[in-house]
């Protein structure tokens, strides 16, 4: 009887260890988006999007650290990748782009500080959580003091690069 109890104890311990093994081996996936890479205008134009949106924003002059800006392009992620570009901004040669999680109304939480990008080129972010709301905040170190009336384009897509 003692041998049976000992055998069952060892068997139960082995079964418990086996059930824990897959979760212990699982890799931690990034929970926050990060810049996948900066992309050229040609690369941006070649993206086959799931969704596309365009709009206008008054692009303000940035502070010295590039962290201020105006919120624009709120969206609910329908794919885990998004690219954003300022297509045109009279008087500007570059822009800063920051990605936020949440709504413009609630202010969101910053998930990527900022990237300085040439007008016409874009920033591509990956690791978005599908169904979550995001928006961008933009500014420009080369904008006139009164700002610049800029046009933007946003594309969501499955990974293509």
Q: PLM features: residue spans?
A:
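Short, surface-exposed beta-strand/strand-loop-strand elements in extracellular ectodomains
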Residues: 93-107, 113
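Short proline/glycine-enriched turn/loop motifs at strand-loop junctions of beta-rich domains
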Residues: 89-94, 131
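Noncatalytic modules at the cell exterior or secretory-pathway interfaces
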Residues: 81-84, 127-142
């Amino acid at each position: 009887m003692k041998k049976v109890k000992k055998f069952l104890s060892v068997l139960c311990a082995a079964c418990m260890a086996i059930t824990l093994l897959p979760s212990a081996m699982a890799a931690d996936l990034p929970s926050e988006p990060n810049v996948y890479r900066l992309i050229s205008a040609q690369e941006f134009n070649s993206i086959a999007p799931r969704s596309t949106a365009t709009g206008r924003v008054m692009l303000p002059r940035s502070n010295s650290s590039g962290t201020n800006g105006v919120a624009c392009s709120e969206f609910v992620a329908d794919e885990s990748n998004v690219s954003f570009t300022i297509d045109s901004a009279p008087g500007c040669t570059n822009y800063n782009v920051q990605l936020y999680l949440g709504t413009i109304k609630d202010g969101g939480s910053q998930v990527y500080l900022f990237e300085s990008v040439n007008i016409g080129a874009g920033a591509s972010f990956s690791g978005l959580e599908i169904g979550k709301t995001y928006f961008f905040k933009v500014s420009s170190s080369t904008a006139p003091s009164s700002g610049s009336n800029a046009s933007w384009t946003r594309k969501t897509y499955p990974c293509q690069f």
